Regions:
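Short, Lys/Arg-rich, polar N-terminal cytosolic tail immediately upstream
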Residues: 2-20
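Membrane-interfacial loop-to-helix junctions in multi-pass inner-membrane proteins
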Residues: 20-40, 101-122, 153-163, 182-207
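Divalent metal-coordination and catalytic microenvironments
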Residues: 28, 77, 181, 217
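Alpha-helical transmembrane segments of multi-pass membrane proteins
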Residues: 40-58, 130-134, 214-215
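Membrane-interface helix-loop-helix modules in multi-pass inner-membrane proteins
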Residues: 54-178
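Early transmembrane alpha-helices of polytopic membrane proteins
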Residues: 200-223
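Conserved small/polar residues in nucleotide/adenosyl-binding loops
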Residues: 225-231
């Protein structure tokens, strides 16, 4: 009887294996590793776009691509590098180091941590797919200001939705960081005893929560103008 019980309960973790382990994981180290790998992949994609830009600017005149595609590469390079390479890299380091530095077993909201990561691949798949649209990808420059944002064809609403999803991911991650730092420090570790890396992320998280809704409002107005302005097709 006891042998049968031991056989049935020899593994108490019951964790999924294979790809499901990475899809469903709530371990802060696993999620941090996925953030870092995702950042590296986006860095290579953004780097290829930068190579196209630099090759075109190698000397005066048209070299490799038409001006419209050059503008698309400039816009996508900015979005990929900022939201796909730089920010996920720092979030990956935060997932790895913050719980260890403050003596916490994991992030305060592990499932939210998983969700905030898996938003990124879907958002960037949608964003990069606009390059294959008949009207081409967004060609609004780094700032997405009108009037350039009004001539992006059908790709602009998809790009704006992607930025909304990326902002949602950032807000969820910032909430998780704040909850972890304020509630899961080791006994005796006051705010003044925290490492500077943890302090940096605590301040950054508050700034993200304050700034991302402003960005969301700005790009929402751009989307509204793009969809409703009768003269949105500028030639």
């Amino acid at each position: 009887m006891s042998a049968n019980i031991d056989k049935l309960h020899d593994d108490h973790s019951h964790t999924p294996s294979g790809i499901m382990r990475w899809i469903t994981t709530t371990n802060h180290k696993d999620i941090g590793t996925m953030y870092l790998w995702f950042s590296l992949i986006m860095f290579f994609i953004g780097g290829l776009m930068a190579l196209v830009i630099r090759a075109e600017l190698f000397q005066p005149g048209l070299q490799l691509v038409v001006p419209g595609f050059f503008n698309q590469m400039t816009t996508m390079h900015a979005l990929v590098m900022i939201f796909g390479a730089v920010m996920p890299a720092f979030v990956g380091l935060a997932n790895w180091q913050i719980p260890i530095m403050i003596g916490a077993p994991d992030m305060a909201l592990p499932r939210l941590n998983n969700w905030s990561f898996w938003i990124l691949p879907f958002a960037f798949t949608m964003m990069l797919s606009t390059l294959f649209f008949e009207s081409g990808g967004p060609a609004a420059g780094w700032t997405l200001y009108p009037p350039l944002s009004l001539q992006g064809g059908d790709s602009m609403p998809f790009v704006i939705l992607s930025i909304h999803l990326l902002g949602l991911s950032s807000i969820l991650g910032a909430i998780n960081v704040i909850a972890t730092i304020l509630n899961m420090r080791a006994p005796g570790m006051t705010l003044m005893k925290m490492p500077i890396f943890v302090w940096t992320w605590l301040i950054t998280a508050f700034l993200l929560i304050a700034s991302m809704p402003v960005l969301a409002g700005a790009i929402t107005t751009v989307s509204y103008t793009h969809l409703t302005l009768p003269t949105k097709r500028i030639v």
